[in-house]
Amino acid sequence: MQLLKQLFKKKFVKEEHDKKTGQEGMTLLEVIIVLGIMGVVSAGVVTLAQRAIDSQNMTKAAQNLNSVQIAMTQTYRSLGNYPATANANAATQLANGLVSLGKVSADEAKNPFTGTAMGIFSFPRNSAANKAFAITVGGLTQAQCKTLVTSVGDMFPFINVKEGAFAAVADLGDFETSVADAATGAGVIKSIAPGSANLNLTNITHVEKLCTGTAPFTVAFGNS
């Protein structure tokens, strides 16, 4: 009992001394609370920063897609065919070719989400080779995929969503005959093919299923 009295007396004396000298310290619980608050604030700042970056990239992607689409149609449509692109390297070369021709800037040819050039594939229209083209944007998260498709989908008559960081010619199908089925959330979700169930944002199933699968995703936006 005497020992407890001595301990309490020492604690009281120390607290009084700390108050007088201004050296009052923080308890472990107080430290934990402060660190917890700092962690929550930091997480919030990171989240807001990421949203700001995504929003900026989304705006840039829409601008770049529009610029490249205009450049492709103005440069090649009157020629009757688009340059053949057998693989991803050729698709990148086609994008770089537009830069070399002065049709777009190097920055306009880039995928803002990856910092690399967007791939531009030529693909069939009604079984005729190289009559259509698709601009691909890869390396997308599911959220980025959904936002990009819903943001710029009206600019293009053909949209194909693919799981994976890259696309290939074989993934695209045919501009005129590949039937869209937006209810699947992947593959061709918008097309001019008869019988297509094109993406409709007023259809809840289409919205829920959009960009179904595992990230990363690649979206191909096509025209002819």
UniProtKB/Swiss-Prot annotation:
Compartments, as annotated in UniProt: Fimbrium; Membrane
Pfam families linked to this entry: N_methyl, TcpA
N-methylmethionine carried by residues: 26
Signal peptide (UniProt feature, chain positions): none
Mitochondrion is among the record's keywords: no
Reported induction: By ToxT that is required for tcpA transcriptional activation. Mechanistically, interacts directly with the tcpA promoter to mediate activation.
Phenotype when the gene is knocked out: Deletion mutation abolishes Vibrio cholerae colonizing capacity. It also shows loss of observable pili.
Resulting phenotype, residue 45 to T: Loss of autoagglutination but pili remain intact
Effect of residue 25 to T: Loss of autoagglutination and pili
Function description: Major component of the toxin co-regulated pilus (tcp) which is a type IV pilus essential for bacterial aggregation and subsequent colonization in the host small intestine.
Domain notes: The leader sequence region and some other sequence particularities suggest that TcpA may represent a novel class of pilin, and imply the existence of a novel signal peptidase.
Protein name: Toxin coregulated pilin
The species this protein was found in: Vibrio cholerae serotype O1 (strain ATCC 39315 / El Tor Inaba N16961)
